[in-house]
Amino acid sequence: MNIFYDANKIYEAGTKAIKSAPFKYQSQLFEVNHLLLTAELQRDIKEWKYKPTKGSKFTINERGKIRNITTNDMIDKTVNHLICDNVLTPAITPYLIYDNGASQKNKGVSFHRKRLEVHLHQYYRKHKSNEGYILLIDFSKY
């Protein structure tokens, strides 16, 4: 069965979309109508009628910096989760290095701390010294 037609997968994706911001009005409204919206989305996908919306655009002033925000509709977020969780993630995961934990399940902060410790021990065994460098990179405003 095509995952895009599977109501259970669509419902799961909608639940994940709600979890991103359960306190927001849009999420709460979606949750109240979750089953109905799942059925409607399933029908629209089957009949090739689904079209992403433009979303909402607004500006906020955060700590003195003006930010232009674009947000997607909950239905679009559901479709994004459906595609990412069931198609893209399984397709690219086999090609990622083990140490890449960016946004991957079960690869949080503790995973990276343990991996850092493993690499430090490997470095010490190889060079018999603690003298060396660690390069830390943080991408911002990209």
PLM regions: where:
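Non-catalytic, polymerase-adjacent accessory regions of viral genome-replication enzymes
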Residues: 1-43
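Short, charged/polar micro-motifs that form catalytic or ligand-binding hotspots
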Residues: 27-31, 68-73, 77, 102, ...
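Active-site-proximal segment of RNA-dependent polymerases
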Residues: 84-142
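Non-catalytic, well-ordered alpha-helical scaffold segments
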Residues: 8, 35, 39, 76-81, ...
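Short, compositionally biased low-complexity segments
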Residues: 4-21, 53-57, 84-92, 124
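Reverse-transcriptase-like RNA-dependent polymerase core
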Residues: 41-65, 120-121
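Conserved pre-motif C helix in the palm subdomain of viral-like polymerases
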Residues: 65-97
